């Protein structure tokens, strides 16, 4: 699933082709995604794109009349193509611009979503989201206070969008390994020092991943068709049975919160 770095990469990649230009029309080929594509999108014509942003794992296209909100789901990707580019299987939505470019959305598993809203502050899926991990609001004091008396595994805790947004399974594994924290350690038992290290490492790892275009494991591609190169930097995710890069002990794998977790039992203590 595309996580925060992948959505940020997608936003950065399409911005030069959308921002400041006009949407001529939106072509919806498959309205039945995870949620039905908002019918208002098919009615959009000659609307100027005024900005692009991201909230959690949602891509937001600002227009003069409202907001187009996209979620890439499990396997979605956006790319910039020309009008003569052939439509492939799973190309479900096109945003046709007046500059001769098309933002095309492809989603083999159809778990993504595209919405329209006139008021971003009242968009229901944003109502319970926690702070952005790269913002000043997300700091060690916040994380430590939020974790108090929480019996939840620390991995599930940092993946909870009500605590902090955008941290998926890949980056949660990497962050906990860098911090030397066992994924099953109760969040309520992390110390102030560990909360500070966790906050710092989350920010560092996400920033590094964004700089390298995210992580491509299977489906994700940048808007220019290139993979995300952070996959080459992964230390522990997907490396069951491989030697730990810190101590050489074999990396173990088990499930935490219904997600695959990778851990070095020597380096990551409960």
Swiss-Prot record:
Monomer. Binds 1 zinc ion per subunit. This is Formamidopyrimidine-DNA glycosylase. InterPro entries: DNA_glyclase/AP_lyase_DNA-bd, Formamido-pyr_DNA_Glyclase, FPG_cat, MutM-like_N-ter, Ribosomal_uS13-like_H2TH, Znf_DNA_glyclase/AP_lyase, Znf_FPG/IleRS. Involved in base excision repair of DNA damaged by oxidation or by mutagenic agents. Acts as a DNA glycosylase that recognizes and removes damaged bases. Has a preference for oxidized purines, such as 7,8-dihydro-8-oxoguanine (8-oxoG). Has AP (apurinic/apyrimidinic) lyase activity and introduces nicks in the DNA strand. Cleaves the DNA backbone by beta-delta elimination to generate a single-strand break at the site of the removed base with both 3'- and 5'-phosphates. SUPFAM superfamilies: Glucocorticoid receptor-like (DNA-binding domain) (SSF57716), N-terminal domain of MutM-like DNA repair proteins (SSF81624), S13-like H2TH domain (SSF46946). Its EC number is 3.2.2.23, 4.2.99.18. Its cofactor is Zn(2+). DNA binds at residues 90, 109, 150. A zinc finger (FPG-type) spans 235-269. Keywords: DNA damage, DNA repair, DNA-binding, Glycosidase, Hydrolase, Lyase, Metal-binding, Multifunctional enzyme, Zinc, Zinc-finger. The gene is mutM. It catalyses: Hydrolysis of DNA containing ring-opened 7-methylguanine residues, releasing 2,6-diamino-4-hydroxy-5-(N-methyl)formamidopyrimidine; 2'-deoxyribonucleotide-(2'-deoxyribose 5'-phosphate)-2'-deoxyribonucleotide-DNA = a 3'-end 2'-deoxyribonucleotide-(2,3-dehydro-2,3-deoxyribose 5'-phosphate)-DNA + a 5'-end 5'-phospho-2'-deoxyribonucleoside-DNA + H(+). Belongs to the FPG family. NCBIfam families: fpg, PRK01103.1. The active site is at residues 2-3, 57, 259. One of its GO terms (molecular function) is class I DNA-(apurinic or apyrimidinic site) endonuclease activity. GO terms for biological process: base-excision repair. CDD domains: EcFpg-like_N. The keyword Kinase does not apply. It holds the Pfam family zf-FPG_IleRS.
């Amino acid at each position: 699933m595309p996580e925060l770095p992948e959505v940020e990469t997608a936003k950065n990649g399409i911005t030069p082709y959308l921002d400041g230009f006009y949407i001529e029309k939106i072509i919806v080929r498959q309205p039945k995604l995870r949620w039905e594509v908002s019918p208002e999108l098919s009615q959009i014509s000659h609307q100027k794109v005024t900005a692009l942003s991201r909230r959690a794992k949602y891509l937001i296209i600002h227009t003069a009349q409202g907001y187009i909100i996209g979620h890439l789901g499990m396997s979605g990707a956006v790319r910039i193509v020309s009008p003569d580019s052939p439509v492939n299987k799973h190309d479900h939505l096109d945003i046709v611009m007046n500059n001769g470019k098309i933002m095309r959305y492809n989603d083999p598993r159809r778990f993504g979503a595209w919405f329209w809203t006139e008021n971003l502050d009242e968009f229901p899926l944003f109502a319970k989201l926690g702070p952005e991990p790269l913002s000043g609001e997300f700091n060690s004091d916040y994380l430590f206070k939020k974790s108090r008396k929480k019996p939840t595994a620390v991995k599930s805790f940092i993946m909870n969008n009500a605590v902090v947004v955008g941290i998926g399974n890949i980056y949660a594994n990497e962050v906990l390994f860098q911090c030397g924290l066992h994924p099953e350690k109760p969040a309520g038992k992390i110390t102030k020092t560990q909360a500070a290290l966790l906050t710092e490492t989350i920010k560092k790892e996400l920033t590094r991943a964004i700089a390298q275009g995210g992580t491509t494991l299977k489906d994700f591609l940048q808007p220019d068709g290139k993979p995300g190169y952070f996959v080459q930097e992964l230390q522990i995710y997907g490396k069951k049975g491989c030697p730990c890069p810190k101590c050489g002990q074999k990396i173990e794998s088990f499930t935490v919160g219904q997600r695959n977790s990778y851990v070095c039992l020597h380096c990551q203590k409960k």
